[in-house]
Amino acid sequence: MDNETKHVSHSDVLKAIMNDSDKTATDISRELGLNRSYVTNTAARNNVRIETLATIAAAYGYDLALIDRETNETRYIIEPPK
């Protein structure tokens, strides 16, 4: 992905992260201590919880952020659950 901001659905975000990474979805699922198909199955769903998205994004090396639309300032980083 380039540095351009993308407006996409959460499942598209997961698919893009998976495609951009050298790590496989199976690698990330196992790193999280979950079923080997967890990440792939999650990316196929239309109802991914924010906590799940934050957890998978963090495992791929990304932060999930809330950005102020008026200022384009990153206001909050959503931490995955501990």
Where do the model's predicted regions map?
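A short, Lys/Arg-rich alpha-helix, primarily the initiator
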Residues: 1-21
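Key DNA-contacting residues within the recognition helix of helix-turn-helix
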Residues: 15, 40-41, 54
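Alpha-helical residues within the helix-turn-helix
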Residues: 19, 30, 58
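Short alpha-helical "recognition helix" segments of helix-turn-helix
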Residues: 24-29
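Recognition helix of helix-turn-helix/homeodomain-like DNA-binding domains
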Residues: 33-48
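DNA major-groove recognition helix of helix-turn-helix/homeodomain DNA-binding modules
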Residues: 51-67
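Short, charged recognition helix plus adjacent turn
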Residues: 67-82
